[in-house]
């Protein structure tokens, strides 16, 4: 089995991305490739990663403008990850995340299945005002009241076959590609890994190890920041110490 680490980034996050890549070089072992997807016209210093440059929709896509340029499109790219790597499994990692200790593909699996954390909405809705939007968008997307939130932390390993199955489901339900459906949604109308997690939990529960965090949270190997806040001196110092 082969495993790719996939990062969708853009120029504003390249400062974060440099730390993310340094952490991968330091701590990631046993992965076949690292794929960094960036917009056409942007550039990065030469690295060991395979860079893929893609065109992104412009201001004609109203929902993209409302989200900030490219926000919805990066969600679309992630749900098409199988088009950017031939590996059997894809590990999604955001630019503003760094690995904090050695990690291998086996660390992301339980009994040979990708580990996927989920938390009952009833336990967390009162703690985060944004989660209500996730419930509404998941209900609108699937027609089913969601029981769990599936975007608990980075990173997330997903089998290659799951992306095409998911896109087929979207077309069967909405008669639209995932891209067309997503770009037509309002602000916070797309929560891609919640959509995919809910779908896989319902249709393929025996192929993913879904873990209810009510029964404990496995140790994390990722430090996740909030890129919109910028790299503060405190965060920079913390990342530098981890990567020293």
Please tell me what each predicted stretch does.
Residues 1-19:
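N-proximal low-complexity "stem/linker" segments adjacent to membrane-targeting elements
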Residues 90:
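Short aromatic/hydrophobic "clamp" motif used to bind/position activated sugar donors
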Residues 216-244:
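Long, low-complexity C-terminal extensions of enzymes
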Residues 22-31:
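Short, acidic, metal-binding catalytic loop of nucleotide-sugar glycosyltransferases
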Residues 99-133:
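Conserved donor-nucleotide/metal-binding helix-loop-beta segment in metal-dependent transferases, i.e.
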Residues 94-98:
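The conserved acidic donor/metal-binding loop of glycosyltransferases
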């Amino acid at each position: 089995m082969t495993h790719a680490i996939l990062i969708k980034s853009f120029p504003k996050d390249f400062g974060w991305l440099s730390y993310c890549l340094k952490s991968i070089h330091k701590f990631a072992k046993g992965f076949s490739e690292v794929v960094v997807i960036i917009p056409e016209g942007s550039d990065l210093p030469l690295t060991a990663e395979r860079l893929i440059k893609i065109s992104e929709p412009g201001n004609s896509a109203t929902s993209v403008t409302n989200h900030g340029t490219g926000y919805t499109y990066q969600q679309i790219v992630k749900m098409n990850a199988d088009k950017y790597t031939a590996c059997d499994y894809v590990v999604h990692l955001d630019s503003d995340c760094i690995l904090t200790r050695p990690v291998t593909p086996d660390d992301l699996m339980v009994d040979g299945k990708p580990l996927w954390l989920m938390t009952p909405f009833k336990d967390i809705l009162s703690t985060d005002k944004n989660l209500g939007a996730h419930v509404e968008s998941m209900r609108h997307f699937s027609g089913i009241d969601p029981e769990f939130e599936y975007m608990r932390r980075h990173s997330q390993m997903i089998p290659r076959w799951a992306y095409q199955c998911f896109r087929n489901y979207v077309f069967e339900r909405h008669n639209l590609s995932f891209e067309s459906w997503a770009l037509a949604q309002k602000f916070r109308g797309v929560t891609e890994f919640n959509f995919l997690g809910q779908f896989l939990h319902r249709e393929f529960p025996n192929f993913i190890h879904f873990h209810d965090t009510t029964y404990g949270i496995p140790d994390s190997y990722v430090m996740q920041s909030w890129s919109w806040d910028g790299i503060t001196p405190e965060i920079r110092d913390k990342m530098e110490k981890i990567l020293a």
